Amino acid sequence: DARNTENELDLEDILNIPSAGFNNVRYYAWAWAGCEFFQNHPKTKQIFSKLPELAKLDEDRFNREFLDLHGNNLEELKRDWLLFINEIDYGYSVPRGCLSKASSPGGQLNSGQIKFRISAERSWQVTEQNVQQGERFRIKSSGEYVVGQSNPQTPWKCQPNGITIQYHRGRPLGRLQAGILDLNAKTAEQQVKGLLNPLDIGLSGVISAPTSG
């Protein structure tokens, strides 16, 4: 309930929860969310497993040491954290929810078209194609994947339009969406804003880029 409100905590807020704060249900829940994230994120799980070695340090030094261990990954972790708390639900997979890179098997096609392969089992995948605010372009998609099953013999096969047997946030389950990641923005919140407010695509959609990215 605290997501997307003034009570939302970023990664550094999580680390700065005082010891007395764990008597508060709100802070306790946020701390466990942080543990789930750090324990399962591909770039933090090994470091997280070594935290008992830092337990003898005072709170301030513990936090500094922990942040220093993440080095150049901190900005990436901040983005992934925001995506995590926006989507977290029962059964959520942190590794699959992290930003990843879309593959480009065919390179650039004729007429300025570019082809990418998107993995249906992962969340946002970056194409590394730059767009300018107001630029219009069309995205077409094809393929088939399974998004669920009634039983082992009845898989829910799906195409990029999604299936209306179940909806997620007002859209058919499995429907293709697009978002603009603005890595030039100053904060992680501004960088992933376009991913938290995705554009509907399905099998085909024309986008007028709301921002550059």
Describe the predicted segments one by one.
Residues D1-S93:
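Acidic/His/Gly-enriched intrinsically disordered linker/tail segments
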Residues Y90-G213:
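Gly-Asp-aromatic-enriched flexible segments
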